[in-house]
């Protein structure tokens, strides 16, 4: 939610996004409020999200760069993404030694952001049964209508994604972001 911050107007009140036109000093105050109220051990590693397949190792890259995923293998490193309609995905290994967060919109999912993040962050030596994933709040299929460009892009990459699309009329489908992420 955005309750409890200091932003006003259309950004009211706990806006954490520095990319939407809110005053940067107010966004910084909101981010400090988040750290304090959530008892975070450090400021999150904020990213410049670009709806693509790139991720960064947050315990190595201190400054946020253009990426849609961040992971850490060190304690007290906070990974974060911002979402509205897009799907936030939280990942960790069963031992809790590695964590990741992914900003997964249709472009990122279609370009393989989840697969690439898992490969980079966990490596190929960890079996899939050792990975835990949580899918956060995102736009649901009843509210997400897409055209053939999105559908065709997904099916070209992953033909098994046909269950992510329900045709509502000629050239328009409801898109299930959750099903496509699974």
Where are these predicted regions, by residue range?
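Active-site microenvironment for binding and transforming phosphate-containing groups
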Residues: 1-182
């Amino acid at each position: 939610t955005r309750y409890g911050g200091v932003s006003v107007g259309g950004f009211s009140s706990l806006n954490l996004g520095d990319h939407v036109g809110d005053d940067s000093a107010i966004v910084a105050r909101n981010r400090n409020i988040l750290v304090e109220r959530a008892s975070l051990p450090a400021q999150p590693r904020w990213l410049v999200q670009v709806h693509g397949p790139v991720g960064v190792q947050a315990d190595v890259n201190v400054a946020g760069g253009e990426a849609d995923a961040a992971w850490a293998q060190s304690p007290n490193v906070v990974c974060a993404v911002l979402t509205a309609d897009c799907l936030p995905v939280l990942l960790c290994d069963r031992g809790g030694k590695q964590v990741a967060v992914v900003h997964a919109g249709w472009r990122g999912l279609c370009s393989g952001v989840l697969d690439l993040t898992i490969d980079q962050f966990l490596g190929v030596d960890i079996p899939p049964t050792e990975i835990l994933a949580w899918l956060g709040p995102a736009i649901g299929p009843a509210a997400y209508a897409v055209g053939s460009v999105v559908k065709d892009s997904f099916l070209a990459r992953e033909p098994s994604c046909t269950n992510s699309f329900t045709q509502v009329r000629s050239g328009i489908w409801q898109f299930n972001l959750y099903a496509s992420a699974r």
